[in-house]
Structure formats: C-alpha cells, structure tokens
Amino acid sequence: MSETSKIIAVTSGKGGTGKSTVCSGLGYTLAKQGHRTLIIELDFGLRCLDIMFGLQDKIEHDLSDVLSGKMNALDACAKVPMASNLEILCAPKTLTPVTAEQIYSICRSVKKYYDYIIIDTGAGINSHVFDIVEQANLILVVSTPDQVCIRDASLMSDEFYNRGNKSQRLIINKVSKKVIGNSLVKNLDEIIDKIGVQLIGVIPEDFKLTVATAKGDPIPTESEALLAFDALSKRLNGDFVPLTIKGA
C-alpha cells in the first residue's frame, strides 16, 4: 500500500473484547488530532459503528453498495459529525461475500484521501480474517484480561507471525478500576507474556463510554477511556507517550 495512508487492522480472537469500541475510540481521537481517518467495518450482518456514532438513522449506503459496483467507496462513506476528520464505511446489514482483495482494492481507491484507514475485522480465528489483515501496515490485537480472550489472542497472534505478519501490537481492553494500580502490573506482564505481543495501550473499563456508545451519544470528553485512546493515537503517530495504567 502507498505511504500516503497507514492501514491499521484491528482484530480479536473472539467476540466481546470491545474491538469495535476500540476502532471508534481510536478513529475519533486520531480525527480530533487532525488526521483524516476512515474506519471500514467488516462485521457483516452485525454492524454497530453507525449506532456508536449516532448515525443509525442516517446511513444511506454501506459496503455492499461498493462491492456490488453500485457506487464508489468515497461516495458510500458517511461523515461523523462529532469529528470532522472522521468518516465510516459501514458493514452491510446482511451477510455479504467479500474477499481480501476487494477490501484492499477499496483501500487503494481511497488511500490518498486519508492519513489512517482502520479496518474493523470480524472477530474469530479463521482464514478470512488472516487474509484481510495480510496487507495492513499494523495489526492491533485486542484482548480483555480474562483467560479465554488471552488464549485466543495468543493463538491468533501466533498465526499472524507464522504468516509473516510481524508488525503487531497488543491492546488490553476493559481493564476494571478494581484492579488498576500496582497490583495489576504483574497481571499485565503475564498477559503480555502469554500473548507474546508488545503492549501499546491499556483501555480502562469506562461506564460513561459504554453508555455513550450504546446510545450513539458523543464520546464524553471526561471519559478515562478517551484519555487512553488519545494516548494510543499519539503513540501510533510516532509520539512518545509513557504507558501508564490510568489514562494509558
């Protein structure tokens, strides 16, 4: 892919990790920092980004219109009012066949218009996801601090490495306030060791963010999770931001 845009694939070993929330938070903060950002949603039949950004009644077109040749990708994208530099290309409401080449053909067609293209992959360990992330510049593996997610994230990461995808980073999501503090550091280290991927961000569990995204309200500026996404966005852009637990 061209150097004019950076393609980031956000994926997880299982559903329920908050992968789409990570995509929305990351896309929002990148856009707020002045980066032209597009999120392409691939959870076919299970789309949710429209709700997260309060656009559930305003999406006129989605990825199926592009795949069918009805319209080009730029025209199918929806602008997000709460962040002027952010656009989303929503997944179809129904299951629709798609190949990795089709997705990257779309990326190639719009790459000069964006600084970052975030691909919200479907969850799960399968060849389709592995093919989709093949040409991404960076893979963000999302896990929560529970044993099932950790094991699945480890299996997924190992398969990425086996396929030659070396550029991976780990995001630990939904970290409860109850365990934020010195006692968590050892547990975080254990998670990193088990998954085998360098940590780039810890996102605290945040009730305000959960409620806002569920209702399609603007992301609350006082949200601790938003501070963590802001720090994560800066790291992805090459800035040095110390990785702390609170506001990670």
Predicted regions, residues:
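P-loop/Walker-type NTP enzyme "switch/lid" segment
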Residues: 39-112, 211-218
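Conserved C-terminal guanine-recognition region of P-loop GTPase G domains, centered on the G4
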Residues: 151-165
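Conserved nucleotide-binding/hydrolysis micro-motifs of P-loop NTPases
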Residues: 44-46, 94-95, 124, 146-148, ...
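Inter-motif core of Ras-like GTPase G domains
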Residues: 126-147
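C-terminal lobe/tail of nucleotide-utilizing enzymes
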Residues: 162-248
